[in-house]
A protein has these predicted regions:
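A short, basic N-terminal segment
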Residues: 1-38
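P-loop NTPase nucleotide-binding core
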Residues: 44-49, 53-161, 167-168, 173
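Charged helix-capping and loop-helix junction motifs
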Residues: 175-178
């Protein structure tokens, strides 16, 4: 991978690399201790404090990359359970693209409700995600399939949900309880959530 040239050593707005991540060792170690021990974590702070960068930094640690599958889903722009299910499905699908084809085939087998929008190019074999939010007829079923798929992975999965407070705005009620049920039911999964106040 090409090394990124950064002219300002005080990067704000996105994660670049360990080299440019300002000394958050305590927070990184605390997060590691919680996640490695299977605890679901809630991070709450005002905006622009670096919560998402901390998660990205944590996900880029060698031991975490070697032992876990990691997913970061920003739900700030969502307004429904269907949009949440769409973003979760898309995040997982896109992370599978570079993996061997058997992972993609397993994804299609488990994710029956998304199968219509996830296709393989007949010539190249490359996967594509051509699904729209409106294609998700039953978001509850899709969420169940997503978490079933993650529970079958050969490594523990960490799904960080950014701007988690957004679910309070959904028309559907008890979304937090539904996600909590998945977090508790699937021992192969950790759901750190990040909220801005």
């Amino acid at each position: 991978m090409n090394k990124l040239s950064v002219y300002n050593p005080f990067v704000v707005g996105h994660y670049v690399s360990d080299e440019y991540f300002c000394d958050r060792r305590q927070e990184t170690d605390f997060l590691r201790k919680q996640i490695v021990n299977g605890r679901n974590v809630v991070m709450i702070s005002p905006r622009r404090i670096g919560k998402s960068d901390l998660i990205h930094h944590f996900f880029h640690q060698e031991d975490i990359r070697a032992q876990y599958y990691t997913f970061f889903v920003d739900i700030y722009a969502t307004s429904s359970l269907a949009e949440l299910a769409y973003l979760l499905g898309k995040s997982i699908f896109l992370s599978l693209k570079p993996r061997p084809r058997k992972w993609m085939e397993h994804f299609f087998q488990v994710m029956k409700s998304l199968r219509v929008g996830c296709t393989l190019d007949s010539m190249s074999g490359d996967p594509s995600f051509n699904l729209q939010v409106g294609d998700i007829a039953s978001p509850e079923v899709t969420l169940h399939e997503i978490f079933d798929y993650l529970s079958q992975a050969d490594r523990h999965c960490i799904v960080a949900i950014y701007e988690f407070q957004q679910i309070a705005e959904y028309q559907e009620k008890n979304v937090e309880a539904v996600l909590r049920t998945y977090a508790v039911s699937y021992t192969h999964l950790t759901l750190p959530t990040i909220c801005s106040v």
